[in-house]
Amino acid sequence: MNDLKKSPLLILDFGSQYTQLIARRVREMGVYCEIYPYHINHEQFKKLNPCGVILSGGPSTVTHDANPRAPQWLFDSGLPLLGICYGMQTMAVQLGGQVHSSALREFGYAELRLHGHSQLLNNIEDRILADGSALLDVWMSHGDKVTELPPGFKIICETRNAPIAGMADESRQMYGLQFHPEVTHTLQGLRILQRFVVDICKASTDWTPEHIIDEAINKIREQVGTEKVLLGLSGGVDSSVVAALLHRAIGEQLVCVFVDTGLLRLNEAEQVLSMFGRHMGIRIIAVNAEDKFLTALKGVTCPEEKRKIIGRTFIEVFDEEAQKLTEIKWLAQGTIYPDVIESAATSTNDAAVVIKSHHNVGGLPDTLNLKLLEPIRELFKDEVRQVGLELGLPHDMVYRHPFPGPGLGVRILAEVKKEYADILRKADAIFIEELHNAQLYHKISQAFAVFLPVKSVGVMGDGRRYDYVICLRAVETVDFMTAHWSQLPWDFLGKVSNRIINEVEGVSRVTYDISGKPPATIEWE
C-alpha cells in the first residue's frame, strides 16, 4: 500500500470556527488532509507536496492591509486552490481584484443562482427554475464582498446581496466561494468539496479505517521494535482505541495502568478491567486511588482549582506506578488531531483565553524518561470511533457520550465528597439507563447528571425532609462548539425523576437544564 499521507490536501487556516469542519468533510471522502497556519513556510509547504489547497474563512477583513494574507508564492504554485469566504476575499485582493464592506451583510441561509458553466459547480443544484436557472441553498457568514474580479476570473454564482458569490479561473484551477460548503446547512456542500478535492485536485481516496489501521500497526512495530509500551487507560474512547491498536500491533509488549480516581461512572472500573483485561488479555495494573484524590480535593470548591488538583494527582499516581516498571521504554497517549492543531497554535488568534483547564494537558514528568508514542494523533474523533469499530471494540463503548477528564469532580458543584460522588454516580446511571431503554441515547450527543450543593424540602411518606437536588443535562450538537438542549419527552423526564428520587437516597428534587451553548457551556464547571 502507498503512503496514505503522500500528497495530502492542505487547508490553510485564517482563524475560522469552521476550519476543522472543512478537514473533517475532506476526511469523510477518504482523502487525507492537514491543517496549517496561513503563513506556512515555503520550504515546509514544498516538502508536504500537496495535491491542492483550501483557504479557510476567518474573522478578519481584507479591507485592512495589516490583516492576514495567503503567501503570495502560493498563487504561482500551479496547484488547484479553493478560497472559502475570507479565503476567497484574500485571493481576490492578492490577485488584483477589489473587496469592500457591504451595506447588506449576509448571515445564515441564502439562495444562490449559478452562472453558466464551471468545473466546480457544474450539474450541482438543489432545484431548477422554469427559465432553466439552477439554484443552491447555501450558508453565508460575511460582511465584506468581492466587488471586482481579479484578471482571468469569471463569476460562477450570485446571491441577491452578493453579485460575485463565487469566482473561477479555470485555466489556473483557482476557485472562490463566498458561502460555506463545509456546513450542513449548505445542502450540496459535500458534493462541491468533493468536486474540488477528488475531481479537480485528483486526491487519493485511500484514507479508510482499514488502511489507517494497517499503516498505524506498521509504524508502531517499526518505532517500538521489541521494547515495552506503557499506556494510561481511562476507558474513554481515545485511550480504548489506542489500547486495542497497540495490543494488535505489539501484543504482550503493552502494559496499561488504570487509575480509579473515585470520580468515575457507576461500575466503570469493573467494565474497563473486564473488557481489556479479562476479555482481550491486556496486562493492566489497576490502582484504587479514591482516598488520595478525595483528600487532595478536600475543602476545594473552585472549578479551575479542582481540575488542576485532579490532573496533578493523576500524574503523581501514574508516575508512582510507572517508576516501578523499569522495563518500559515508551509512553503511549491518546492524543488526537484537534489536540495537535490547538497545541500547534494554528489559530490566527494569538491571544487565547483559557476557558477550562484540561487535566491531561502538560503531560507526565520528564523524570519518566520515556519516548512518546501517539498512534492516533492524526485522527479526528469520528475517525477514532470508526477505527475502534474496525478493531472490534463494542459499539456502545466506541459511541459512549463524552466524559470529562476530571470525571464527576466537575459535575459536583461544591467540595468533592464521597457522599456527593456516590449520589451523583447512581443518579447519572439511572438517567443513562433510561435513555438506552427509550432508545434515545444515540439520538442525543451528550447526557449526564449534575449534583447541586443545595438542599430542598421534600415529602417522603408522612414526613418532610431536606435533601439534595440533581439536575439532568442533555444536548444535541454536531461539533460541540454550539449545542441545543435536547427536548426530551416530558413523560420520559418524569420517569427518570421518579426513579432517582425513589432509588437514590439523599435526593429530594430533580431539575432539567434547558440552556443552550452559548451562552452556557455543556458542562456546568
Swiss-Prot record:
Residues 8-206 form the Glutamine amidotransferase type-1 domain. One of its GO terms (molecular function) is ATP binding. Residues 207-400 form the GMPS ATP-PPase domain. It is an enzyme of class 6 (ligase). InterPro entries: Class_I_gatase-like, GATASE, GMP_synth_C, GMP_synth_GATase, GMP_synthase, GMPS_ATP_PPase_dom, NAD/GMP_synthase, Rossmann-like_a/b/a_fold. It comes from the Bacteria. It catalyses: XMP + L-glutamine + ATP + H2O = GMP + L-glutamate + AMP + diphosphate + 2 H(+). The keyword Transmembrane does not apply. Keywords: ATP-binding, Glutamine amidotransferase, GMP biosynthesis, Ligase, Nucleotide-binding, Purine biosynthesis. Pathway: Purine metabolism; GMP biosynthesis; GMP from XMP (L-Gln route): step 1/1. One of its GO terms (cellular component) is cytosol. ATP binds at residues 234-240. The active site is at residues 85, 180, 182. Its EC number is 6.3.5.2. The keyword Ligase applies. Catalyzes the synthesis of GMP from XMP. Homodimer. PANTHER family: GMP SYNTHASE [GLUTAMINE-HYDROLYZING], GMP SYNTHASE-RELATED. This is GMP synthase [glutamine-hydrolyzing].
